[in-house]
Amino acid sequence: MGEEGGSVSHDEEERASVLLGHSLGCEMCSQEAFQAQRSQLVELLVSGSLEGFESVLDWLLSWEVLSWEDYEGFHLLGQPLSHLARRLLDTVWNKGTWACQKLIAAAQEAQADSQSPKLHGCWDPHSLHPARDLQSHRPAIVRRLHNHVENMLDLAWERGFVSQYECDEIRLPIFTPSQRARRLLDLATVKANGLAAFLLQHVQELPVPLALPLEAATCKKYMAKLRTTVSAQSRFLSTYDGAETLCLEDIYTENVLEVWADVGMAGPPQKSPATLGLEELFSTPGHLNDDADTVLVVGEAGSGKSTLLQRLHLLWAAGRDFQEFLFVFPFSCRQLQCMAKPLSVRTLLFEHCCWPDVGQEDIFQLLLDHPDRVLLTFDGFDEFKFRFTDRERHCSPTDPTSVQTLLFNLLQGNLLKNARKVVTSRPAAVSAFLRKYIRTEFNLKGFSEQGIELYLRKRHREPGVADRLIRLLQATSALHGLCHLPVFSWMVSKCHQELLLQEGGSPKTTTDMYLLILQHFLLHATPPDSASQGLGPSLLRGRLPTLLHLGRLALWGLGMCCYVFSAQQLQAAQVSPDDISLGFLVRAKGVVPGSTAPLEFLHITFQCFFAAFYLALSADVPPALLRHLFNCGRPGNSPMARLLPTMCIQGSEGKDSSVAALLQKAEPHNLQITAAFLAGLLSREHWGLLAECQTSEKALLRRQACARWCLARSLRKHFHSIPPAAPGEAKSVHAMPGFIWLIRSLYEMQEERLARKAARGLNVGHLKLTFCSVGPAECAALAFVLQHLRRPVALQLDYNSVGDIGVEQLLPCLGVCKALYLRDNNISDRGICKLIECALHCEQLQKLALFNNKLTDGCAHSMAKLLACRQNFLALRLGNNYITAAGAQVLAQGLRGNTSLQFLGFWGNRVGDEGAQALAEALGDHQSLRWLSLVGNNIGSVGAQALALMLAKNVMLEELCLEENHLQDEGVCSLAEGLKKNSSLKILKLSNNCITYLGAEALLQALERNDTILEVWLRGNTFSLEEVDKLGCRDTRLLL
């Protein structure tokens, strides 16, 4: 049934106190009041853990509210706690008001007992009815037995009251001490051999528990040590290069953190996800699985996932947040996978995180007893070489098993159930299997524009430096686009002198940026008198052996899914102390205690960069092998290849240690990053640099030709896999993330000829790239290719991270877009105004979908200008933004001069009556608009009157959506008058508008004179069941 947790958090205690302090807790609690508070009661019963729920059952059983048969019905293994809580409420409600009152009292007793346990009454140890007394004093007996079940079982077995099998069943490691005590009492209830009398007598002799274990000195000492340990690990932010140590408090900058929304769920349109604070990680509603314990944070490489966890650890250790957890255990997945020996939960927590100096048994039991006060964090799940599976079940917290089985069962809740777990990962590593066990999923999207600026100001407090850097970024959109990932912002900060002094162009591609940081490190490792200006061939050639050693190590690590390197592995790769001193290898974070300090690359992207460098320049790499990198005939994708024996770097002479084998075994998302870097290194831009370092220019030319051929072939294969269009329809394709990386590789190579060739093969009418982690850098790559399309395309980029900077990157391809969908992309007025400024000159662009962004009245003038100037524009969807009456009035001016618009979406804004009036006046004589949505805009009867006048005049509008307003009967009566004179409207949606039978009657009278209208939606209004039946019979066009 899982581990218990007798304590609840401060927030939960407060909520419970508020609920129990209301009328439900008094003697006058009625069944109606009980039912009205059902959702709050369910939340209360499941807010702590299974221990709190079972404590409530103890009290109800002792008061005979529940019969023995009722009680047994709540002990079905594997049932979610929320299901059990609802079943308990149903059972109690059916028993009447007295039972409802008793459940409230039981919840009060259980809450009080969790905070300050006390002995409730006493009993006669020589009772004539021992089984009945065991039941009536059950809560106190469970508390007495808590730490003495083992001894009591041994004694009962010696006396012959229980069998060895029964002892083993009660001792199963999945049960906590309290659960074992309850199962012993349950056994005594059904056995008629004297066990009940034996327990009643001997439990009386046990010592009374004086205090919660949480208050014990041993526990407090361990908690203090754990806080100190976590604080020491998280107080300072080691920069990627390890060259400087910054106080995390001084440098930490909030990232854009959003909760993942299931767009497939039914219900009203959702607003764009709000940017959350870290402190909301465990309190956000909208759970994927209410019974799961694991919180997932996904983000691209370099988006700041590790730093976010470090911030969480620091806030907890400093006592500033997350204080509902008494124990926080941080782990790194790249460190965990290095553990070859089997280990248990106890070994993991104590030997690989924080060792208790005294009382190890008591402290571990405490963790098992109170899992809801425990938080475990696992950073970098994408770097864990074992793929998640739920096939191997492991439920014992003391029995050792493999590290992957241990981790997977922790995430599923088979171990330390009710303990919170936080996992960070790149999106590609999260499978559908894992998502089944996720409570809440968050997207970490990197820095906002304000975040980039704030970070640079925190890094550079010298007068003027930050201002100059920010101006440089704002003037260089490609570089600005890269910086939304914190790792690039760090690079810009690190190389600020080089960037500000550069006379040529600023870095444009990812490869440019990494070569700049390489130059920075090489210059700082070179004596001042011999250092040249910039990354010249002589500088690179002088350290080429070092770079190749690092590249060989990086490539081997990718092939082996190894990201932390021991001294032996460094030696086998011929990495010398001089190579290490260059600064790209740093001491691994979260080093396993007792081991020698291993090293790791500054960041996973640096490991990929050096692997690409090795592939570009090493004489050991035949050019033909590059096909494995660009997905051209990769046998390593087959299941058989994945089962090949793992190799070791020491056996480099073996067949499996070849470059091909390494590329076949590497994780796909790491190969994609490496491929993009290799394409950039082999570009014409960097040809001269590499040619000076290559003994054979012919070999470099062959590599370059091979990379071009592989890229072109992979794109051709991707395009040929697109199924043909249905007759009469445009060809549509939903591109996958792999396609994005091929486009990014093409962009890194910066060859217009290849881009034009790729565009010729993309013969589609609708290109869909939703949920593909498209940020500003990907937008630049897409525009680089799509601008060469011969036919216009509808480009759909919903649910990505485009932002204002990404919009700017898309402008070069706007001329070939016939429609652009940018739903849920954190775009503000600034980005849209730039987009529209360009769209004024793009005759192909006829549709814009911008709902679920951050648009306000500030963009209304640009929108109005677009409508007034572009007389072939067809659709403008602005739903779920922040536009008010003022913005609607400005937009109405543009509508008056427009003769082409067919679809106008305004749902979920704040236009109110004044905005509705302005739009209605502009649309009265409009000759093309067919669909208008003003759902959820706070429109009342005044706005409805204006819309009714519009309906009386308009002869084109076919659908009007007015749900979720407050039109009421007065507004509906006005609309009914307008319908009497209208001859075009086919669908009128009026759901959820506080309409009564009076308003419906007015609509029926209008429908008698209107044969055009096909549907009137009236769901969610204030009709009785009789009125619904009556109205439906009178006219079937009323949808009730």
Swiss-Prot record:
Subcellular location, record wording: Cell membrane; Basolateral cell membrane; Cytoplasm; Mitochondrion
Alphabetic keyword roster: Adaptive immunity, ATP-binding, Autophagy, Cell membrane, Cytoplasm, Glycoprotein, Immunity, Innate immunity, Leucine-rich repeat, Lipoprotein, Membrane, Mitochondrion, Nucleotide-binding, Palmitate, Repeat, Ubl conjugation
CARD domain boundaries: 26-122, 126-218
UniProt-annotated binding residues for ADP: 239, 252-253, 302-307, 603
Lipid positions (S-palmitoyl cysteine): 395, 1033
GO biological process, one term: innate immune response
PROSITE patterns registered for this protein in UniProt: CARD, LRR, NACHT
Primary residence: membrane
UniProt membrane topology term: Lipid-anchor
One cellular component (GO) term of this entry: mitochondrion
Origin superkingdom: Eukaryota
Motif (ATG16L1-binding motif): 63-77
Domain NACHT residues, every copy: 293-618
PTM per Swiss-Prot/TrEMBL: Palmitoylated by ZDHHC5; palmitoylation is required for proper recruitment to the bacterial entry site and hence for proper signaling upon cognate peptidoglycan detection. Palmitoylation promotes localization to the cell membrane. Palmitoylation protects from SQSTM1/p62-dependent autophagic degradation. Polyubiquitinated by TRIM27, leading to proteasome-mediated degradation. Polyubiquitinated and degraded following muramyl dipeptide (MDP) stimulation, conferring MDP tolerance and preventing septic shock.
Binding-site residues, ATP: 299-306
Ranges for region Required for CARD9 binding: 241-274
LRR repeats: 791-812, 816-839, 844-865, 872-884, 900-920, 928-949, 956-976, 984-1005, 1012-1032
InterPro entries per the UniProt record, alphabetical: CARD, DEATH-like_dom_sf, Leu-rich_rpt, LRR_dom_sf, NACHT_NTPase, NLR, NLRP_HD2, NOD1/2_WH
GO molecular function (one): muramyl dipeptide binding
A Pfam family per the record: CARD
Activation and inhibition: ADP-binding promotes an inactive closed conformation.
Keyword Repeat attached: yes
Family per similarity comment: Belongs to the NOD1-NOD2 family.
Function statement: Pattern recognition receptor (PRR) that detects bacterial peptidoglycan fragments and other danger signals and plays an important role in gastrointestinal immunity. Specifically activated by muramyl dipeptide (MDP), a fragment of bacterial peptidoglycan found in every bacterial peptidoglycan type. NOD2 specifically recognizes and binds 6-O-phospho-MDP, the phosphorylated form of MDP, which is generated by NAGK. 6-O-phospho-MDP-binding triggers oligomerization that facilitates the binding and subsequent activation of the proximal adapter receptor-interacting RIPK2.
Domain comment, as recorded: The ATG16L1-binding motif mediates interaction with ATG16L1. Intramolecular interactions between the N-terminal moiety and the leucine-rich repeats (LRR) may be important for autoinhibition in the absence of activating signal.
Protein name: Nucleotide-binding oligomerization domain-containing protein 2
Organism annotation: Pan troglodytes
